[in-house]
């Protein structure tokens, strides 16, 4: 940690977004003594986790004039991280066994996550800092290191304000990334990105190709298989010869290597040589980072899903500490990442912790990029740090002077990932890490975060 010699100061900070990252960041900023205004374009907290049956007017979300929907949640979604690890460290995501309106499962549905987020906002009185139905349309640096934030409310009124700092928490699951497929422009079938997928009904009796086989791809392919004639998964992570029948009750799901080409007769050719005639393609191919409101005078750019340059995925050196990002990395312990990153941002803004010089931060960034290159890791995976998530979070925690990440959190998430890969149909309901669950609830008890004996959760959780 780099403790500052300067006097502790309170800053006027704008936070963009009232999803989990924005809510947690706002709490930490206020705890550090800053005054905070949160801008949220929707009517409620929750961000991504606010489910809506609506979707973008363009199913591929390529048309810049399309009507947009922020959420990418599908109706059947359940978490892919266990609730013990998912919650904020001083506000655990506890099951409500006595409330039938809540989902008490270890891997709950999206409505339970939204309820937890709403509970968090109420508990810490975050909503009093939020301007709902207010969209940020422009953020730009001005004199003296300050920032101009232009916002537009539901009535269309534009307002310009000056802030000492801006923390961007707008999420990165809204702007779809579409994989390039040879011949796709002349292929006649339907195409949709998972951002716009909600329920399987539109695919009834169809032959469907799902591109991508990680969390959303595994979920959506099996969801569609309930109603489709056939579902074929195309995965670039598989060997070119891959062709496997996947066991599902409907007996209609296959795994392939990636697509080689498509044709105007409706055929799709996989690199394993198999040919099918499909009705629809669903792209489960991830998302792009997107900050359409942000003007940085060329100091920050996005290149192949790399937001650069960013010191430790948070601070752009030339603009720090007045501009910061919370929540960019892809990892399993997401809410805890929001918490630890925002503690660091809050401490730096108050002057309690100092950053290295601009040159030192750039040296660190370039060393990180060089290490990725040496390992052959593509630029698009710059912010994919799941394998080193505990190491990264503990480094940030030490910088901000807060508690390190509990051992059991990383172990739960890593074990869950292995189960997801090996048993995507059952990993949420069958597990073999009860000792980690016990360790988690004993930890909550020691910290006086639960008022009943840990055995209550252990016995009812099964």
Curated annotation (Swiss-Prot):
Keywords of this entry: FAD, Flavoprotein, Membrane, Monooxygenase, NADP, Oxidoreductase, Transmembrane, Transmembrane helix
Family matches, as InterPro entries: FAD/NAD-bd_sf (IPR036188), Flavin_mOase (IPR000960), Flavin_mOase-like (IPR020946), FMO-like (IPR050346)
Pfam families named among the record's database cross-references: FMO-like
Membrane topology note: Single-pass membrane protein
Main location: membrane
GO-annotated biological processes: glucosinolate biosynthetic process
One function term, GO molecular function aspect: 8-methylthiopropyl glucosinolate S-oxygenase activity
Protein EC: 1.14.13.237
EC top class named in words: oxidoreductase
Transmembrane segments: 318-338
Subcellular compartments: Membrane
Reactions listed under catalytic activity: a (Z)-omega-(methylsulfanyl)-N-sulfo-alkylhydroximate S-glucoside + NADPH + O2 + H(+) = a (Z)-omega-(methylsulfinyl)-alkyl-glucosinolate + NADP(+) + H2O
Residues holding FAD: 17-22
Deletion consequences: Increased accumulation of methylthiopropyl glucosinolates in leaves and seeds.
Binding sites annotated in the UniProt record for NADP(+): 212-217
Record's note on what induces expression: Down-regulated at late stage by auxin.
Function summary: Catalyzes the conversion of methylthioalkyl glucosinolates of any chain length into methylsulfinylalkyl glucosinolates. Prefers probably short-chain methylthioalkyl glucosinolates in cv. Landsberg erecta.
Listed PANTHER family: DIMETHYLANILINE MONOOXYGENASE
Family classification: Belongs to the FMO family.
Protein name: Flavin-containing monooxygenase FMO GS-OX3
Taxonomy of the source species: Eukaryota, Viridiplantae, Streptophyta, Embryophyta, Tracheophyta
Gene symbol of the encoding locus: FMOGS-OX3
């Amino acid at each position: 940690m780099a403790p500052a010699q300067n006097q502790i100061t309170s800053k006027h900070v704008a936070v963009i977004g009232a999803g989990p990252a924005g809510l947690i960041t706002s709490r930490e900023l206020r705890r550090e003594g800053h005054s905070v205004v949160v801008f949220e374009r929707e009517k409620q907290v929750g961000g991504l986790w606010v489910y809506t049956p609506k979707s973008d007017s363009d199913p591929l979300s390529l048309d810049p004039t399309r009507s947009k929907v922020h959420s990418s949640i599908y109706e059947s979604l359940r978490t892919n991280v266990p609730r013990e690890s998912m919650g904020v460290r001083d506000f655990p995501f506890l099951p409500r066994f006595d409330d039938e309106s809540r989902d008490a499962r270890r891997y709950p549905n999206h409505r339970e996550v939204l309820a937890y987020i709403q509970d968090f906002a109420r508990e810490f009185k975050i909503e009093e800092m939020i301007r709902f139905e207010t969209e940020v349309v422009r953020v730009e640096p001005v004199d003296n290191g300050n920032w101009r934030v232009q916002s537009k409310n539901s009535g269309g009124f534009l307002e310009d304000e000056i802030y000492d700092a801006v923390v961007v928490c707008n999420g990165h699951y809204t702007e779809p990334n579409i994989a390039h497929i040879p011949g796709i422009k002349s292929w006649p079938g339907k195409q949709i990105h998972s951002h716009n997928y909600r329920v399987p009904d539109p695919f009834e009796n169809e032959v469907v190709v799902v591109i991508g086989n990680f969390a959303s791809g595994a979920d959506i392919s099996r969801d569609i298989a309930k109603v489709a004639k056939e579902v074929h998964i195309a995965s670039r992570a598989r060997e070119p010869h891959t062709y496997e029948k996947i066991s599902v009750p409907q007996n209609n799901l296959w795994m392939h290597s990636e697509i080689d080409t498509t044709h105007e007769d409706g055929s799709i050719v996989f690199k394993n040589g198999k040919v099918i005639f499909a009705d629809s393609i669903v792209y489960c191919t991830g998302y792009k980072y997107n900050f359409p409101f942000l003007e940085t005078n060329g100091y920050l750019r996005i290149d192949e899903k790399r937001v650069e340059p960013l010191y430790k995925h948070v601070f752009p050196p030339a603009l720090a500490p007045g501009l910061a990002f919370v929540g960019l990395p892809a990892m399993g312990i997401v809410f805890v990442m929001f918490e630890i990153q925002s503690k660091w941002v809050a401490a730096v803004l108050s002057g309690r912790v100092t950053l290295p010089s601009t040159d030192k931060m750039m040296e660190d960034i370039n060393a990180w990029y060089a290490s990725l290159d040496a390992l052959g890791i593509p630029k698009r995976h710059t912010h994919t740090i799941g394998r080193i998530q505990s190491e990264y979070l503990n480094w940030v925690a030490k910088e901000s002077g807060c508690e390190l990440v509990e051992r059991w959190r990383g172990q739960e998430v890593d074990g869950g990932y292995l189960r997801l890969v090996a048993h995507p149909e059952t990993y949420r309901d069958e597990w073999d890490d009860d000792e980690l669950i016990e360790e988690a609830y004993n930890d909550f008890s020691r910290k006086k975060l639960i008022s009943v004996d840990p055995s209550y959760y252990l016995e009812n959780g099964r």
